[in-house]
UniProtKB/Swiss-Prot annotation:
Superkingdom field: Bacteria
Keyword set includes Signal: no
Protein name in the entry: L-threo-3-hydroxyaspartate ammonia-lyase
Reactions that this protein is recorded to catalyse: (3S)-3-hydroxy-L-aspartate = oxaloacetate + NH4(+)
GO terms, molecular function: ATP binding; D-serine ammonia-lyase activity; L-serine ammonia-lyase activity; magnesium ion binding; pyridoxal phosphate binding; serine racemase activity; threo-3-hydroxyaspartate ammonia-lyase activity; threonine racemase activity
Means of activity regulation: Is strongly inhibited by hydroxylamine and EDTA in vitro.
Pfam family, one: PALP
Cofactors, names only: pyridoxal 5'-phosphate; Mn(2+); Mg(2+); Ca(2+)
Binding partners and assembly: May be either a monomer or a homodimer.
Induction / repression: By D,L-threo-3-hydroxyaspartate.
């Protein structure tokens, strides 16, 4: 298996031009004072569909041939990849079917349907979404695009870090949320090309530390679906495409608690007036845990998404 390279990220950026938002990079005096660092926040919560996932989805679908476009695409997702695929399919004028868990946030399900996709539900505790997706693909001749373990998907995700580093110049450290590894592996390709000395950290919820364990042992660790408010990181294992890139290019994998995610959600709302979903807060929570470790340095965070039900959001912030 040939691993993806930074060249693939560059080509993905060319395909995304005119379709994906070049999301803003914000700063916060409050956060700089708290950490002692100069912190740059890449806001993928302001991406189309409210998440970085649109980047990888559009890049993958844009490479379909005419027969694939006619047959359509099938994907399985807890929400953000679903919306990314649904919108990309609409823009490229192809049918899309999305396999989503029964407990997926209602806002994500509604948005997926509004983009024109057909939604098929599964029970994430008792059913295998990958098998359901493969079966649908075989039955209807559709192409299956996984949410992270695909070279075109991870290359597309890497364009967010490419934009960040082209804006900031070299960074001393960069914090990125970790679920299946699409964003982290794509970010690693861009970071090693544009800021080779940058310390790159993946961040997982404590309950879903399969990535950390995989990184420590050198082989992919499988776990049960983790119980965490970070629904975008409720993955059971890293991917065959993502893990080798992570193993070779990431400095460490950190974990944070759900309580720390809520505190970071509160920070984004109170200090930066931004709605960020729990998974999108992984990077900030990890940086804040490290206190003043990066005093005097330039640090980046990628906020991966802002799709969260209003009721759940209010409930979490109330505590």
């Amino acid at each position: 298996m040939q691993l993806s390279s930074y060249h693939d990220v560059i080509k993905a950026a060319e395909r995304l031009e005119g379709f994906a938002n070049r999301t803003p990079v914000f700063t916060s005096r409050t956060l700089d004072a708290e950490t002692g660092a100069q912190v740059f926040i890449k806001c993928e919560n302001l991406q189309r569909t409210g998440s970085f996932k649109f980047r990888g989805a559009f890049n993958a679908l844009s490479r379909f041939d005419e027969a694939q476009r006619k047959a359509g695409v099938v994907a399985f997702s807890s929400g953000n990849h679903a919306q990314g695929i649904a919108l990309a399919a609409r823009l490229l004028q192809m049918p899309a079917t999305i396999v989503m868990p029964t407990d997926a946030p209602a806002a994500k399900v509604a948005a997926t349907r509004e983009y024109g996709a057909t939604v098929v539900f599964y029970d994430r505790i008792t059913e295998d979404r990958e098998q359901i997706g493969r079966t649908l693909a075989e039955q209807h001749g559709m192409t299956l695009i996984p949410s992270y373990d695909h070279p075109d998907v991870l290359a597309g995700q890497g364009t967010a870090a490419k934009e960040l580093l082209e804006f900031t110049g070299p960074l001393d450290a960069l914090f990125v949320g970790l679920g299946g590894g699409g964003m982290l592996s794509g970010t690693a390709l861009a970071t090693r090309a544009l800021s080779p000395d940058c310390l790159l950290y993946g961040v997982e919820p404590e309950a879903g530390n399969d990535g950390q364990r995989s990184f420590q042992t050198g082989s992919i660790v499988h776990i049960d679906t983790p119980a965490t408010i970070a629904d975008g990181a409720q993955t059971q294992h890293l991917g065959n495409h993502t893990f080798p890139i992570i193993r070779e290019n990431v400095n460490d994998i950190l974990t944070v608690s759900d309580a720390e995610l809520v505190e970071s959600m509160r920070f984004f709302m109170q200090r930066m007036k931004m709605v960020v979903e729990p998974t999108g807060c992984l990077g900030l929570a990890a940086l804040r845990n490290l206190k003043q470790q990066f005093r005097g340095q330039r640090v980046g965070i990628i906020v991966t998404g802002g799709n969260v039900d209003i009721e759940k959001y209010a409930s979490l912030l109330k505590g």
